[in-house]
Each structure stands twice: as structure tokens, then as C-alpha cells.
Amino acid sequence: MKMQRSAGILLPISSLPSPYGIGCFSQEAYDFVDWLKEAGQTYWQILPLGVTSYGDSPYQSFSAFAGNPYFISLDALVEEGVLTAAECKKANFGRKADDIDYSRLYTERGRLLRLAYSRSDIGHNEAFTAFCEKNKWWLDDFALFMAVKDRFEGKPWIEWAEDIRLRWQPAMDYYRRELYFEVEYHKYLQFKFEEQWRKLKAYANSKGIQIIGDIPIYVALDSADAWANPGLFQLDKDNIPTAVAGVPPDGFSPTGQLWGNPLYRWEAHRATGYQWWITRLWYCFELYDVVRIDHFRGFDEYFSIPYGSETAVDGHWEKGPGIELFRAVEQALGKREIIAEDLGYMSDTVRQLVRDSGFPGMKVLEFAFDSRDTGSASDYLPHNYPVNSVAYTGTHDNETLVSWYQTILDAERAMVRDYLYDYATPDEQLYKSMIALILRSAAARCIIPMQDWLGLDNAARINKPSTVGQNWRWRLKKTQLTKKLQKEICQLTTRYGRKNWA
């Protein structure tokens, strides 16, 4: 698939400006689309839209299919008449406009959304009935999962009573009756989420802006997917994991990363012709124009860590499905636009899988000058970027460009200066030279995190892997979206042949 030179900005929905504690599908989202259009951009890349759980990571969701109710626009619910502006204004979402207070969000948004549901008369809404019927293949299990989880005070499903943990039919029937209105409440949230998201995406597309969605390779252990489909995962007869996902020790983490996600039972997927994965990707393309798949190397080989391990040091590599999976996807769905997140340790077989798939891989500028790299730093030097790639200054997992340059070794900073052949620009302005560097690379697509365009430090970092507590919290202030910055972005995008003229 031929890729035109283009550019975009990475900004999570959660990071949009908003008076209600977190970015959402409100007017601010539509304003950002307009801002992107005027800045000459083609893409808005976001992070996964799933229902977040403990730790607030969008990569650890209660479902591979459900959307995050935090993103539902309260203003839209006011317009519908199921909330009042006074009720929304009275809610305390925290004091900081550039931060997300998830504990307050859980309490205040939850209260308002339940209030909206109670006033909705949703049972007589034909569109809601049609939505539930169309999506029952995932929605019924998800809504029941969330309702039962609430009944068990938020405990992971592997700690529920045996009858419902193992989905015995009498227990399933009992909880569907007992928790009918709780189940309907969670279906209502998904109905409003999809209704509002589809409207926003249609608006973006009408302005020539395409949405790059993002999906993690794995589902969370505490998810409706694992509970409803235990045979597709490496679980024992009691539905307890036998092994979990992660990555091995490297220069960034001496004990590796223990993610804890259940691993796929690939032989079971193969026996169905990879139907679950085909369905998952089909659904993703209902929501997004382009899909980035996180940890793409896991399809070639995946790191298996014994369940119960405290670190990843005892893990080992096992063979994944390889190109066979993507041949099945292409046969079922046709050619679709997928970005392979092929970062980290790269073996020859992983490189071959990316080539065989035809998907563009990712190139991250920050990796090009880091002495902790695993041997592929030259792949990330901009003069080596192939056309069929997507160039980034950094991702949600990296330091902002400004802080990265401040924290690398003196010798590495010298390498950056030498590569740029720029010894005059002040350190605090050098991020602009680095952005221009990848914009003029051969990579067909170039995506810049919003924080890097703004020249922000690590106070605006989205995530620091293997840590909890202060991640996924940064929000953009509306005053930061200036006409001056918009003009500067448009000029650079135009200069390097990436402007969206649509």
C-alpha cells in the first residue's frame, strides 16, 4: 500500500483540555480536530480507548472491545436533558487543569453517569436496543462481567466464587436476573461511548483528519475477554494462568518487565482460523482509520514468565503464530492499514515478520543516540528510515524530547549535536531541530507527540514503564494550543512535503 508523505500529532483523548477532570468527546475534541486541520496535519494518533482499571493504564483494560466511560461528554448528556449544567459544575474533579485525579474521577464521573442513566428511559430507546443486539457478541459478557465485579467489590474475576468464576450456567442465569439493572447500566455507558465516538470520528474524517488507534497485543488478566474465553489463553482447569507476559532484562531494566497479562493459547486460535483476532481487528477498523499494534514482536516470539514470578528473570522465549495470523486477517478483512510497533530487542526473525507483513514499522529518534540500546541504534538514525515506516521523536512510554536531551550522557549529547551539525542552537531550543530532522526523513509518516511540539519537560510525560501512581495523568491546557504554534507546525509540515491539502 503506497504511503503519501504526511504528518500527525500524538495526543491521548485523556490529555485533551476539559473542565470535567479528563479529556473526553466534548467540544474541546472537535476544536482540536480543527486545530490539527489548520496545522496541516493528516493524523491524530491516540492511545487505546478501553475501560481502564487499577493503575489507570489504557493498556490494561477490562475489555478488548468496550470503551472508557470517562470519555463520555458530560456536556452532551446535559444537551440530552439527563444531566444539568449545575450538577456537572458542582462536581469536584480536582484543582489542576493539567492533571487527572483518577480517584476523584472514579467517584464524581461515576455518580453523574449513574444519574444520567437513571433519567434516560433507555429501555424504550430503539437505537439502544439495536446497539445491544448488534454488539451482543461482546457486550453481554462485558456488561455482566462489570456488574458481577461490582458485586464482588472490585475483586479480579479469578477471585470470584467458583460457580461464576467458571461460568456455570445456573450462576450465569442467576446473576443476569439478580443484576439486570446493573448490566443494563454498563450497556448504556457503552451505547453513549460509541454514539459519541462515532460522531467525533466522522467529524475528524470530514476535515481530512484520520484517526490512528492503538491496541495492546495482550488483554488484561482481569478482563471480560479472559473470563469469557478461557480456552483462548494459557489458563489451567481452574482458569488460573500458567504463564504470563513480559519482556526480558535489558539495559533499561535489569530484571525485565513483568506485565502479568495472560498469554494466548495459539494452537486454540489456529484451530479456529484465528477468528478471535480477525473479529478484534475488524472491530478496531470500525473505530479507527489506522491501527497501531503494540509489541508486534510478540507475534514472532513471545516472552513467557511462570505465573507467580516476582520479576521477568525466569522467563523464556516461545514461538508465536508469525505471518500465518496476518495472512488469515488479510484473507478475511482485505488489506488494512496497520502500524507494527517493532521497538525493543529486534531479532532477524522479527525483522522478517515485519517485512513479510508489509506493515510499516516504527522509528524513534530518541533510540538513535542511547548507549543502552540493544544493538540497533543505527536503525533509528533518520538517514536510515525507509519510506515504509512511521517516524516519531518519542512515544507515550518515552521521556519528552526536552527532558531526554537533558538526561542523556554528555557523550550522547555530543553525538546529537554532531549528527545535527548544529552547535549554535541553545539546548532549550534544540528540540525544534530534532523535530525538523525527522520531518525531512524519508519515512512516509511522521508523528510528533504534542508535548514535544510544545517543548515540555517530563512533567508532561505520559508513562514511565514499570512504575505506577503518576502515569497517564498529563493534560493539555487550552491556552497551549496557540495560533503561533499552529502556524509553526504548518510551516514545517509544508516545508518537508507533508502538509494535508485536503
Regions found by a protein language model. Give the residues of each.
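Alpha-amylase-like alpha-glycosidases and glucanotransferases acting on alpha-linked glucans and related
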Residues: 12, 18, 56-191, 219-447, ...
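Domain-scale activation on soluble regions of proteins
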Residues: 38, 164, 171-172, 474, ...
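Conserved, well-ordered alpha-helix/loop/beta-strand core segments that scaffold catalytic motifs
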Residues: 186, 190-219
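N-terminal regions that are enriched for targeting/export leaders
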Residues: 1-14, 30
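Outer-envelope exported proteins of Gram-negative bacteria
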Residues: 47, 210-212, 216, 290, ...
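Catalytic domains of carbohydrate-active enzymes, especially glycoside hydrolases
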Residues: 27-52, 287-288
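Surface-exposed amphipathic alpha-helices with a cationic face
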Residues: 37, 197-205, 330, 354-355
